[in-house]
C-alpha cells in the first residue's frame, strides 16, 4: 500500500475487482451469448431450407441496420448544424486543452518542441499515448464525416471535409501543447494523428471493410481518476492510459460466410495496452502488452434485443468505437516488464 501527500492510499496491484478478473466468468459470459444465438440461427437455416429463393443481398447477411447510415438533417436545419460543426470542433478542442492540459494561461509564454519516443520500453507512456492519438483522430474523422454527409454533402466530399476539419482541430491541440508546461509540441503525435485520419477515411470510403474492421477503445476509469472525480479535481480520461486498451477489431458479422451463424455475435480483437507508466504508484512495474482476444459484438446484440429506432442505432454506433470491459483474452504477450527504479 502506498500513500501520497494527500493521504490517499493506493493498492499497488489490484486495480479491478478480483472476481471480474476470473477467466471462468468471461467464459460463461461468452458461452451464454453464443447459446442465445442458436435460436435466430435455426430460423435462418429454416429459411434457407424453405422454398423462398436464396439471396446474397445485404439484409441476408444478418448485419444490424443502423438508422444513422441514412440519416439526414432537414434542409432548414442543415446550414445551422453545419456551422455548429465547423465552429464546435476547434472551439471544443481549445476549451478542453485549456482546462485539462493547462495550455499557457500565463504560465509559459514560449513555444516548446518535445518529441517523445514512441517505440521501446523507455517511452514516457509506453506508446499508449500514440495509440490514443490515433484512435481519437480515427473516431473524430468518422464522426465529422457523418455530420457533413447528414447535412447534404456527397459521400466523397463528406469524407474530405471530415478529414480536413479533424486535422485542423487536432493540429490546434498540438499547437496548444506547445504552450503547455506539461507537454510540448510532439511531431510524433502529429504523425499518429494522420494514421488515425487515414484509417477513418479508408473505412468510410469502403463500407464493406467498415462492416468487418474497426478500431475500438476499452476503458475502465483508474482509481486515481475516480479519486480525482470524487474530490472535484481534474479527471482527464483522454490521458488515463493505465486504464485503457486500444484494439483493432474484426467483426465476424461482416463476413458473409459467418453472418448467419452464432459467430456473428463475436469479435476478434488484437489489442495493445500499457500499465504502470501513468500511475506508477499503482503498479509494481511498467509493462507493455499485446493480446489476442474474443469479445461480444454488442452492436449486433443491441439490434436483436432492442426495437428498431434511434435508441438502438445510437447504442450500435457507440459500440463500434467503445469496447466494453468484458472480453476474453486468449493470448497475452508481455513485451516489456521494467520494475520501477
Region locations from a protein language model:
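N-terminal targeting leaders of membrane proteins
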Residues: 38-130, 134-141, 145-150, 259-261, ...
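Outer-membrane beta-barrel proteins
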Residues: 146-152, 201-206, 250-259, 298-304
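Interfacial helix-loop-helix junctions of multi-pass membrane proteins
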Residues: 172-194
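Residues on the lipid-exposed face of transmembrane beta-strands in outer-membrane beta-barrel proteins
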Residues: 198-199, 246-252, 292-298, 337
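Transmembrane beta-strands of outer-membrane beta-barrel proteins
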Residues: 211-215, 264-270, 292
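Transmembrane beta-strands of outer-membrane beta-barrel pores
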Residues: 219-223, 272-276, 298-300
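Residues that define the transmembrane beta-barrel architecture of outer-membrane proteins
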Residues: 240-246, 264, 286-290
Amino acid at each position: 500500500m502506498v500513500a501520497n501527500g494527500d493521504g490517499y492510499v493506493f493498492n499497488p496491484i489490484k486495480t479491478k475487482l478480483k472476481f471480474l478478473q476470473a477467466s471462468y466468468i468471461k467464459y460463461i459470459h461468452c458461452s451464454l451469448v453464443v447459446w442465445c444465438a442458436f435460436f435466430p440461427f435455426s430460423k435462418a437455416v429454416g429459411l434457407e431450407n424453405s422454398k423462398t429463393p436464396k439471396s446474397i443481398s445485404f439484409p441476408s447477411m444478418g448485419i444490424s441496420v443502423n438508422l444513422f447510415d441514412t440519416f439526414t438533417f432537414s434542409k432548414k436545419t442543415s446550414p445551422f448544424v453545419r456551422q455548429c460543426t465547423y465552429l464546435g470542433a476547434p472551439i471544443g478542442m481549445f476549451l478542453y486543452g485549456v482546462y485539462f492540459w493547462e495550455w499557457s494561461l500565463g504560465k509559459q509564454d514560449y513555444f516548446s518542441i518535445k518529441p517523445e519516443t514512441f517505440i521501446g520500453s523507455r517511452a514516457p507512456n509506453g506508446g499508449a499515448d500514440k495509440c490514443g492519438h490515433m484512435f481519437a483522430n480515427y473516431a473524430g474523422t468518422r464522426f465529422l464525416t457523418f455530420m457533413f454527409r447528414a447535412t447534404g454533402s456527397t459521400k466523397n466530399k463528406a469524407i474530405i471535409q471530415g478529414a480536413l476539419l479533424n486535422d485542423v482541430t487536432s493540429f490546434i491541440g498540438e499547437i496548444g501543447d506547445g504552450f503547455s508546461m506539461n507537454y510540448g509540441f510532439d511531431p510524433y503525435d502529429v504523425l499518429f494523428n494522420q494514421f488515425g485520419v487515414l484509417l477513418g477515411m479508408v473505412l468510410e470510403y469502403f463500407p464493406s471493410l467498415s462492416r468487418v474492421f474497426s478500431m475500438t477503445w476499452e476503458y475502465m476509469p483508474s482509481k486515481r481518476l475516480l479519486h480525482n472525480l470524487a474530490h472535484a479535481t481534474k479527471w482527464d480520461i483522454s490521458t488515463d492510459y493505465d486504464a485503457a486498451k486500444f484494439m483493432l477489431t474484426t467483426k465476424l458479422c461482416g463476413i458473409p460466410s459467418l453472418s448467419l451463424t452464432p459467430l456473428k455475435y463475436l469479435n476478434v480483437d488484437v489489442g495493445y495496452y500499457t500499465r504502470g507508466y501513468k500511475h506508477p504508484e499503482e503498479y509494481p512495474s511498467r509493462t507493455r502488452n499485446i493480446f489476442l482476444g474474443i469479445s461480444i459484438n454488442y452492436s449486433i446484440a443491441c439490434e436483436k434485443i432492442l426495437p428498431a429506432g434511434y435508441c438502438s442505432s445510437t447504442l450500435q454506433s457507440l459500440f463500434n468505437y467503445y469496447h466494453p470491459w468484458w472480453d476474453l483474452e486468449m493470448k497475452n504477450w508481455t513485451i516489456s516488464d521494467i520494475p520501477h527504479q
